[in-house]
Design a protein with these regions (language model features):
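Short, low-complexity N-terminal intrinsically disordered segments enriched in polar/charged residues
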Residues: 1-36, 40-42, 136
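Short beta-strand segments enriched in hydrophobic/aromatic residues
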Residues: 34-35, 95-97, 128-130
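Hydrophobic/aromatic beta-strand elements that line small-molecule binding cavities or substrate pockets
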Residues: 76-81, 94-97, 109-116
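Short beta-strand edge/turn micro-motifs at domain boundaries
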Residues: 91, 104-136
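A short hydrophobic beta-strand element
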Residues: 73, 85-95
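Short, cysteine-centered beta-strand-loop-beta hairpins and adjacent loop/turn segments enriched
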Residues: 97-105
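Acidic surface patches and DE-rich sequence motifs
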Residues: 42, 99, 117
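A solvent-exposed, acidic/Ser-Thr-rich amphipathic alpha-helical stretch
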Residues: 27-79
C-alpha cells in the first residue's frame, strides 16, 4: 500500500503561491499548480484537463483578458476548509482581483479540491467557479 504524502505547505501557503503565479503571469508556475488529470466543473459541464499545455493555453488567454480589464494582481481571501484528510483538502475561497494600485477590483468565489503530490506540494485536482451563474 502506498503511503499518503505529507504536505510541505499549508493551504494558505499554497494559495499564496498560486495567486503569486496569477499576479506575475507565471504560466509555468500555474501549470505546475495543477494535478494531471484534473477537472474543471461548471453547471454547463465538466472538462478533463489531462495535459499541462491545456493549463498553459487557458492561463495565457486569461492573463490577456484580465490585463485588458485593468486587473494586475490577485490575492486569496476567506479561505474556508470544508474538510481536510491526509492528502486531500476540500474548500472554497475568494480570489480578490487588484488594479494597478493594488486596490480591490472585483471578487471571484471558487471551490477547490486540492491533493498532495508525492513530493509534498499541493496541486489543484478540481476547480469550480461559483460566480459564473445567474443568481436566483
Amino acid at each position: 500500500m502506498k503511503t499518503i504524502p505529507t504536505a510541505t505547505e499549508s493551504i494558505a501557503e499554497f494559495f499564496s503561491r498560486y495567486t503569486g503565479y496569477l499576479t506575475t503571469g507565471d504560466i509555468e508556475g500555474l501549470a505546475s499548480a495543477y494535478n494531471y488529470p484534473s477537472l474543471a466543473v461548471t453547471a454547463l459541464g465538466c472538462l478533463a484537463i489531462t495535459d499541462p499545455q491545456q493549463s498553459r493555453d487557458f492561463f495565457t488567454q486569461g492573463q490577456d483578458f484580465y490585463r485588458s480589464c485593468g486587473i494586475q494582481g490577485v490575492r486569496a481571501r476567506d479561505i474556508t476548509t470544508d474538510i481536510e484528510v491526509p492528502g486531500i483538502w476540500l474548500g472554497r475561497l475568494v480570489l480578490e482581483n487588484l488594479d494597478d494600485n493594488g486596490a480591490p477590483a472585483g471578487l471571484e468565489r471558487n471551490a477547490y479540491q486540492v491533493v498532495t503530490a508525492e513530493d509534498g506540494t499541493r496541486r489543484i485536482a478540481v476547480s469550480t467557479p461559483l460566480d459564473a451563474y445567474p443568481q436566483p
